[in-house]
């Protein structure tokens, strides 16, 4: 009896213990399963993808990662705290849905912040806390707060997590997206490590000069001031040292450009210091490592100063200052703006506000102001005359009503449309009258022009164009003359233009070499003599040889505070990116060295072959090939011509912009035409003196107070011999022809020479005068010729018209080939080099035609009929057939992922491994789950026995193995399930086995208890 009782008690204890132990195992392993996803070390995301977490140290790093999804955005804010603990505690309220690593190739859209603790207030929807231990015994608490989570989210960026190699070292990493440029710039913000050496700079010479060394500046004509410094530095300069100087707020260094920059300081081609524009008008230059070991350093610096239209809105005197090391350089300049174009009834004015070459966009402001009476049926149009993108996007046009007095309108054509006290937006009210086109044009209809309106335009231009010309035109009809609607209308036209080009002048062109000498003197510490750096280089260079032209080398545009400085009209700015040694950074002070009042002057023959000036200024420079004339401002009596100067100037960089004045203003009233002529002026730093001798007579023909001077323009070899000069004073037409070529040798048969250089030749007008200069030489024939010899030359057939501000200049150099030897039968030589020649237009209506055509020389003995034809039309190259695309790398098929049950708590079997490199395919892991609902153990994993405790200071092995699998997953093109789930961490498999083991314990215990009860009953 005692044995039975003892056996029953033993069974009772064993059964109760089994039930208790099994229950604890089941409950404990279940919680461990839920918390496994968050039980890992804090991961730091690095931009280069390198691992940044090392468990050997006790440092804590925090990473906030925002992942952009296709449908919604989910972000996790992780906060890490350290608490000393030697135990692992798990507390779970709810397990969040897992987000799978994407397996489709999508654009990267992950934004990361490196080593920055997130201080935002969390709005927890799911809170999960895991306390795991590392080798230092620290406890880390991680809060994951998903803002939104859907099963349809698909990440666009691959996330790779590296497997920990040891139990005490874990280095997960996440690939960084290209969309984090802003965060990258923020983390890599430039920090000055050098010393401020402004106090060590001595200003030996400092000056501010106006346009052409005057005290006047016309911003709308592209004029600006120039700051000149000659500086001396104390010894001991090092890399990173910098000095500052500050400009007054009425000027800036960028004009209408959105790019704010200043030229580099160079010694030859070596950059000694880089410049940057800071806030508050401060300019900073930072020395490079080339300044090391230099003593007795002196430098010269020149910087363009543009009048700020936001600060200086009216005409008048302005004091411009620059302060360096407490020494102030100042100059008082007279600023004058243009008034636009207008008549008795209305006025039209406009200017380019900003210009951004980086994205091919610009903005423009136009003022439409009524003067006297009312004008009805007004149409305002904005058109890109040059640089239009026919397949572009529609511009953004906003209409504002000006609420102030017309007398208070800024002369600088500046409009602060954010000031609601002066500007009221009425775009929505006029939406039915506003028409926008994809080519960048717009049209606005105004029923009654009884208020002043401002039209703000923001559009794009054609990428790669060398000129942008935007025309604003207004057509109106005075109200009191409405019955004469078709006869009494008027038109106002206002042009604003920018010229961008890459000039390839080599310095050996028509105007001679353009050399810029930059001085940078210093001494080395190790030698006694002085070393002088000399930089002799063409002012204009090829931009491709210096910098990538896509980065816009325009120097000047909008103000720092966003107001925007600008100039109207054709103002050409060329920046030479490697043009200045420390003394002259680019050629920023071109107008101070050589200037003109009006006309058109080109410094490079390659891009503009004819250089001439149209000027009445007595101090302007002239060259040997200048054509100078005076224009009757009212030749016909019914035409009113207003001349506005268009200024083109060269900067030191190859790529540049033209910002500036007005061109092509037309007013028509009472059947009379009002025309504003635009003359393009290019200001070049130092245009070389042109020397030479003209042979032959020089004729001066004066008629109707028109003075036309012709020099002896030579033939191709540089000499002009004129034995026959015909002067025809009919309709002011002057024809100058050179002598015909000579004949030598014996000629048999009929010899016929025909030359028709005037067939279908259009009229060329130059200020009411036609100047026609032809140089045509009939071929020189040597030897015996038999048969009929015929030479025909027609170099002017179908030649288009060339206009240059109403003035046409035509210079032809045509030579028929020289034929030597014996020729029999008929010889026919035809040349037509101008057939269907396209039209070229420079500036507004200014055009230049320069032709040099020489046919090849023919030598030898020819029998039979000889026909020589030359057609300069470029051959048509047949298109190259497309090369068939060959895949560079074979694609490795990816086995489909097993289907997963819909319950979020059911674990998903791991995806079979896919080789990371296509060229070395590897078979997937052989494990295949028996049932979709049950997990499959990964390869090389030993399940833990429940009785074996986890060692202190080591990471659980299942987590490590699963991390490796996540890393091995490569993106595939197969569609993925839209279900979101947590990544498998490896704890799942051991958890299930533990739960099974615990369940068996419980069942065994219950069986023993039941048997014990039966024994008691018995």
From Swiss-Prot:
The modification Pentaglycyl murein peptidoglycan amidated threonine is found at residue 985. B- repeats lie at residues 545-574, 575-604. A motif (LPXTG sorting signal) lies at residues 982-986. Residues 37-511 are annotated as: Ligand-binding A region. Residues 1-36 form the signal peptide. Residues 875-938 have a biased composition (Pro residues). Residues 545-604 are annotated as: 2 X approximate tandem repeats. One of its GO terms (biological process) is aggregation of unicellular organisms. D- repeats lie at residues 745-782, 783-820, 821-859, 860-878. Induction: Expressed predominantly on cells from early exponential phase of growth. Up-regulated by sigma-B factor during early growth stages but not in later stages, although this positive effect on transcription is most probably indirect. Up-regulated by SarA. Down-regulated by Agr. WR repeats lie at residues 879-892, 893-906, 907-920, 921-934, 935-948. Keywords: Cell adhesion, Cell wall, Peptidoglycan-anchor, Repeat, Secreted, Signal, Virulence. Fg-binding activity is not regulated by the divalent cations Ca(2+), Mn(2+) or Mg(2+). Possesses multiple, substituting fibronectin (Fn) binding regions, each capable of conferring adherence to both soluble and immobilized forms of Fn. This confers to S.aureus the ability to invade endothelial cells both in vivo and in vitro, without requiring additional factors, although in a slow and inefficient way through actin rearrangements in host cells. This invasion process is mediated by integrin alpha-5/beta-1. This is Fibronectin-binding protein A. It comes from Staphylococcus aureus (strain NCTC 8325 / PS 47). The lineage of its organism: Bacteria, Bacillati, Bacillota, Bacilli, Bacillales. The gene is fnbA.
